[in-house]
């Protein structure tokens, strides 16, 4: 045969295949290691963000609790301070040794007006239903039921005023209610 005949490409040697596979495996390993490092960094960043957010939420909760505690403390303080003039009026009345019944009555009326005004400024309002008002179990407490000319289940008389604070009942009004005919 002659040397000029076309040669067929020969299959790569096993060493070359092995070297190519090793190079490819090394490239793939390097790529995966890089991806792993990137994912670990992202995971660490997210874990850090989570811990910071958790700490911030805890701090916000503590601040809110502190604010509520302060609001209660200073709300009560403000209410108590508004009652001091009423206490002063009672002290002044008791200091008078020679008061007439008329003077005592006038002083008690003035002190009651002062107390009522103070309560109203602090959103404490009286529940004092007029006779004939429909009985409301949310604001009234029936002490007795009596026969009356009025429609059934209406207030006949108020035995003791009730009180609400900002629409929440502190004490229901004690009332007598008309019986059904």
From Swiss-Prot:
PROSITE patterns on file: GRPE
Subcellular location: Cytoplasm
Organism superkingdom: Bacteria
Gene3D superfamilies xref list: 3.90.20.20, Head domain of nucleotide exchange factor GrpE
Pfam families hit by this protein: GrpE
Spans through the membrane: none
One BP annotation, GO: protein folding
UniProt keyword Amino-acid biosynthesis, yes or no: no
Record's GO cellular component terms: cytosol
Keywords assigned by UniProt, alphabetized: Chaperone, Cytoplasm, Stress response
Keyword Chaperone: yes
Molecular function via GO: adenyl-nucleotide exchange factor activity; protein homodimerization activity; protein-folding chaperone binding; unfolded protein binding
NCBIfam families recorded: PRK14139.1, PRK14140.1
Family the UniProt entry places it in: Belongs to the GrpE family.
Summary of subunit composition and partner proteins: Homodimer.
HAMAP family named in the record: GrpE
Function according to Swiss-Prot or TrEMBL: Participates actively in the response to hyperosmotic and heat shock by preventing the aggregation of stress-denatured proteins, in association with DnaK and GrpE. It is the nucleotide exchange factor for DnaK and may function as a thermosensor. Unfolded proteins bind initially to DnaJ; upon interaction with the DnaJ-bound protein, DnaK hydrolyzes its bound ATP, resulting in the formation of a stable complex. GrpE releases ADP from DnaK; ATP binding to DnaK triggers the release of the substrate protein, thus completing the reaction cycle.
Protein name: Protein GrpE
